[in-house]
């Protein structure tokens, strides 16, 4: 299997090929599609997304929350087949106003029905909260979660780059925390929003890579979208593999990678914390 490539296909097909080719990855870093019911996916929702009709250009949603939960379990079973020993899954999953508890049910199902458990939960504070919640009793969500999932048998051995200097009694300054501040996304353009209205930023991915990746690691994004994970990996010195069902998003991602669009300064790996 070719690395440093985004495959225009369903992620389950990509992972089946990984297994057949004995291709493994060190990190899985992704944000799955929202659980938008199929009958609502093509409806205009002006209160939440001004000038945008849908989240994605191709994907039309899931049949039901119950289906989404089962799909999540199958996804993590597939992850188990391609993730290296002591590897990590960095799963950016937030909750919605319509179904605020679904994300937690999905993670609970993963713990119950797969080999994975939650090792950490990172809070990502965005620079703005969009869409703003106009519900009478709900908060506007400026933070999202990144669930750090590892195999239960590897809970004490999974890999990070984290170095703690001193000990808990006399040195707190160099301790890595579960809090990240990073922009929502790289760009706010009509072109990208029509393709994918739920992207994250290269700065966000870079913060995660600083904690869990070394150069030459291979990172897999099962929902690559417009290529943000690939761009961040390229800058960081990691290899990447991506899956994306939207041909238009793959083409846009390849354009970003070839032209260096929306990239960032390569980090100093020696000064992580």
Feature locations, PLM:
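Conserved phosphoryl-transfer catalytic core
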Residues: 51-58, 259-273
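Short, conserved SAM-binding/catalytic segment
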Residues: 1-2, 235, 254-269
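Core catalytic lobe of class I
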Residues: 1-252
